[in-house]
Amino acid sequence: LRVKNQKTGEVTKLEAGFVFLGAGGGALPLLQKSGIDEARGYGGFPVSGQWLVCQKPDIVKEHHSKVYGKAPIGAPPMSVPHLDTRIINGEPALLFGPFAGFTTRFLKQGSIFDLIGSVRATNLRPMLSVSKSNMDLTRYLIGEVFQSHADRVNSLRNFFPDAREDDWKLQMAGQRVQIIKQTEEGGGKLEFGTEIVAAKDGTLAALLGASPGASTAANAMIDVLERCFPEKIKSGQWQSRMKELVPSYGQSLVDNEELLNSVRERTLSTLKLR
């Protein structure tokens, strides 16, 4: 490995038996640099997130929950609009969104050349064909990008009919890179979740795509362990440790009511919800 300190410019060379790439939008370029065959055909489609924010105390105090609506036809699942109570810099606030924005950056502080720099001979066709096979999403994104402040506040009025434009401001939030994956026919398919791409020899794995944070983290890491350490995870020591961390590991909660109740009780207790 060749690791560069972005602040000092210092370059360090390391040797590792296993490498995991969990760099958000930066994972795809790193995966491509690895040169593994399994990375061929993968591309990325960057989408920025925006929110309407209100911090006026008299408005914020009227709402203390998260309320979901329905995603527009063709929109990705994580675009489901919702009105949410948050704490920003110690102050309560209301957020409404998300609204999608187009960018060529893979990270919020990335380069405008991230997208073009990720194009390879092996993923060019999938990346060019993906808009054709995802016209609903393409139309949705174009509509989102060209929305005015008045348009966004008008969407908010489905949740909060008395919303006024002056009380809300638009702020940038996260950045995600949707997976563009090659199909069997050689075209491109846009994926809305996350995916583990792992080297055949188990020395490297990368987490690509976008998801609502911790909701997929545990499952993704279990996938990495099973694919990159297939022999070790079968050992008694690893099996014991896995079941200590995940009591339901390797079992079906659908078919085992007693186990389901036990897991649910453990979860409620751990999260202090009971």
Model regions and ranges:
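C-terminal catalytic lobe of FAD-dependent flavoproteins
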Residues: 106-236
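Acidic, Ser/Thr-rich low-complexity intrinsically disordered segments
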Residues: 247-274
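Central beta-strand plus flanking loop segment that forms part of the substrate or channel wall
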Residues: 37-65
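Short beta-strand segments that buttress and anchor functional surface loops
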Residues: 1-6, 207-210
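Short hydrophobic-aromatic micro-motifs
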Residues: 21, 93-98, 206-207
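Core beta-strand elements of the Rossmann-like FAD/NAD(P) dinucleotide-binding domain
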Residues: 7-18
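An anion/pyrophosphate-binding glycine-rich loop and adjacent beta-alpha core
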Residues: 58-134
